[in-house]
Amino acid sequence: VFDFDGTIYDGESLFDLYMFSARYEPKVLRHLAPVLRYAVQYKMGRATLAQMERGVGGVTCDYLHDVAASRRILRLDGAAPDAGLAGETAIAEGVSALVNEFWNRHMDRIKPWYEPRPDDVILTASFDVTGGEACRRLGLNRLVSSTVDPRTMRVTCLNFNTNKPKRFREVVGPDTVIDEFYTDSRFDQPMIDMARTAFMVSGNRITQVK
């Protein structure tokens, strides 16, 4: 089982995707401050995980709708900006265009030490609509992530902090044994506790911690 951001991907893919999208649709920059505010409030104990989920979920939905409405982002995938797309179709087209172009330019950020194997599981707080494409390109089909309703782009699950072990068991199975777990953060201690062996990743240096 591998954490994604900072572990096998060099950086934070959601932040990189956000800044990448701002190059084509500057309007999305308005969503940065609210997300940071929710994160700081949660970190300082002024908001519960449930409150952060609702707040971040609402901002994410607004952001994805801005992406879907962007004529410049639609052009990334070769779609005509006046193609008459509407509603759910427009959302899917816009997000797909952005995600595909992002990974066209960022797959080289996958760290060289990582060699995908068919039974690998990727565990991440990133969303399935973004991380799923990276997994597809790596030849992987098991992703435990935050999820978005593809019809409405509303967040249905935030795979974060204490939610991770619960979400892992829901997706992979309650009796699944983790032989090896790789992460870049001690915040993943609950997952480290579940694994037979665990490794801390810093850049391309890997240290066994369990």
Which sequence ranges carry the predicted segments?
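Active-site neighborhood of HAD-like aspartate-dependent phosphohydrolases
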Residues: V1-T48
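Charged/polar, solvent-exposed surface patches and flexible loops
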Residues: D16-F20, H31-Y38, R54, G58, ...
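Short, flexible segments with low predicted structural confidence
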Residues: K27-V28, L85-A86, K164
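Short amphipathic alpha-helical patches
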Residues: V28, L32, Y38-G45, V56-D66, ...
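Metal-dependent phosphoesterase signature
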Residues: A50-R109
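C-terminal cap/substrate-recognition subdomain and adjoining C-terminal extension
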Residues: A79-A80, I91-G94, L98-K210
